[in-house]
Amino acid sequence: MSLSEADTRAKLIDPAIHARGWLEDLICREVTLGAVEIVNGKGRRRSSGRTDYTLRIRVNAETQPVAIALIEAKKESLPPGHGLDQAKGYLAASRHNVQFVFSSNGHLFVEFDRSTGLTTRPRPIAEFPTPAELRARYEKIVGFSLDAPSAKPLLTRYAGGEGQRRYFQDAAIRAVFEKVARSAEKNEPPRALLSLATGTGKTFIACNLLRRIADAGQLRRALFLCDRDELRTQGLKAMQNVFGADAAEVYEDGGKNNAKNARVHVATYQTLGIDKEDGDPSFLFRHYPEDYFSHIVIDECHRSAWGKWSVVLTRNSKAVQIGLTATPRQLKCSEQTEEAKADARITADNLHYFGEPVYEYGLAQAMEDGYLAACEIQLAQVNLDARGVTLAEIISRNPRNANTGQPVTAAEIADLYEKQQFETKLLLPDRVNAMCLDLFTQIVNSDKERGPHQKTIIFCARDRHADDVAAAMNNLYAQWCASKGVPRKDPYAFKCTAKSSGNDALPDLRGSSSSHFIATTVDLLTTGVDVPAVRNIAFFRYMKSPISFYQMIGRGTRIDEPTGKLMFTVYDYTGATRLFAEDFITKPPSTGGGGTGPGPGPGPIDPPPPPPEPPVIVDGFEVHMSPLGRFVVAPINGKAMPVPIDDYKAGLSARLTQECPTLEAFRARWVNPPEREEIIDAIVSSGYSPSVLRMLEQMNDYDLYDVLADLAYGLLPRTREERCLAFRYKHAGWLAALPEQARKTIEAIADQFAVGGTEGLENPHIWQTPEVAAAGGIAALKSAGEPKVVLQQTKERMFAA
């Protein structure tokens, strides 16, 4: 019988590479968080996620090991390069920022070289490259020696050890250090751009970059620059956790710079006087001479036009300059709106100045790894939006000036108002009320336990629209509370916009469980606000900017395990989620190039726009919603894309039946933990998540076995409790034949399935659970035979029930 993947690694691959010099201190097992499980309505993760084995080289015993290769194990019965085509090899290498990917069945191995794109023919495992051989090849590829002074930050250990960092954060940090070292060897400007999805820890990366540079003795003074007060507050706290009093906020106090004596300066564009292209950078010039900083980190540079931060970079041209962005490098917007063109200019500026990102970790990968919440989309269309509103319809309904309440004439009204003008030029209270009722109803029905008390952000068209939506949601909530006879948790809905000093309520939105559930905003909450408990994002405004859209989606992507929030729902009434599918590719300006020259200068200043005309308000329309389907955001070819749930289920089913053609084959593999992990990994690596399917189908009371068997093989699903009862009924004869204490123990063990499903049966502490211990525990089970064998028989009978 051939060895499984896990046994192949342990019994064949590990001994072979140990013999070639890859001892345990040079092998790092990177374990992702794993798929989300929900048991008894609370979130928990599978016991483990994907385990990636990286090979690392160490210059000496005191230095930080540097990952240079990934090694994948295959079943002994499979070809050594099974599944490792060029695309998958490049994806794996890029994900971990390594140069080499190896694949082996324990006897032979193949190698993918990221720099050449070539995959070797199978070779005997005894010829696996040694650490010295791979180091020499690595140094040739990256363009510097690990003994060079420029490589010192790369070899400097994490200050607090490696326990807190995630694999992609380490990959990003190494990518920056490699780029800076290579630039030093080539005498090029040391610039690097990182692209990571919102919620994946860009601030953590920035802190550890600067800490390791400081510990390497190469940090003189650093500037951490951001464009929002909230980001500055978060950044300052993070930097002070790492640097203590050596990190300080930049502001003027009595004519002096508060951060004067600090090594790490945390500032906003506004503080430096560069928040506008025609701003006065007097603070910058007054307190910071040229080349004052040795290192500059620009946070969220995807929101900042070149004219805003160029003066900081040009005055510190010798500094190591690092840009952080949450915008996908490949954005191709087919809609040539002004907002999309502005996005294109910003992206082009970033790519032109910094060059291509040295590392990317997108929304799709983060969701697949379990670091960001899964996303469901509920798409709907408003009937008025589909057709527009005509002059005749408005005139027949007594239109008024929205500011004065006075009647308006036909001459003051356009012939046709289209959807993008709703709630800006034409206010439609009936539309607002209908959309709010639909959203409120869906929120209440989505979670019977929480009901309307779910943190939600609604993006509105204008400040007044945000007022109207907040009022409508408060009215609906008050009516709901009255109908249920429950006390209100006020304030329930509130406006959170720049004009309303919306930041004042952010702590309550973030932390309160008894108020501030619905935030209505225009764009204040697009960025810089960390509210992990947000479960719903609603689009009541039409979106044209891909950058803004991704930032808005980012408000919901954080996982919040203390509250059980593992997925979030997007309620899309305006087609905003179409921007998930945009590629949005922009080209750098033709002048200069290569990420080495200065960015483009600011363009001509447009004249100020004329004051807006007062909007028209009109009542009396019949408004209804048309559901357009449910979607789940899934990784498709490395990109986060909305997939219709029926298509998602069909794809998952096809992948499962490819792995296990029959229910019997599925059941036989499911009861074997390593085989079960292989099934799950095969599904997840294809872009599907069984646990997400369970959440979408609202089957939280079912074990994954029943969820998958129902989908792929038509098995009538049983809840965990029903399956436990069926086990006792269908196998009553087998149970009755056992010694009484053994029978009671097995029944107590079976009850653990009702609580925790498959993993409940395999809990290593199952013998210490009060019910099992009280029934006699492992000692009682021995009267029925070898406990391990009896437990396996129990599992087999449980899933055959």
Regions found by a protein language model. Name each.
Residues 1-221, 230-246, 260-264, 270, ...:
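ATP-dependent helicase/translocase motor core
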Residues 77, 99, 270-271, 295, ...:
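Conserved RecA-like P-loop NTPase helicase motor core
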Residues 158-162, 175, 412-424, 434, ...:
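Long, largely alpha-helical accessory region at the distal end of helicase-like NTP-driven motors
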Residues 197-198, 300-303, 315-334, 370:
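Conserved helicase ATPase motor motifs in RecA-like P-loop NTPase domains
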Residues 229-253, 472-481:
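Conserved helix-turn-beta segment of the N-terminal RecA-like "Helicase ATP-binding" lobe
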Residues 263, 415-521:
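Conserved C-terminal RecA-like helicase domain
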Residues 284-323:
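SF2 helicase catalytic motif II
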Residues 336-453:
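Interdomain helical connector at the RecA1-RecA2 junction of SF1/SF2 helicase-like NTPases
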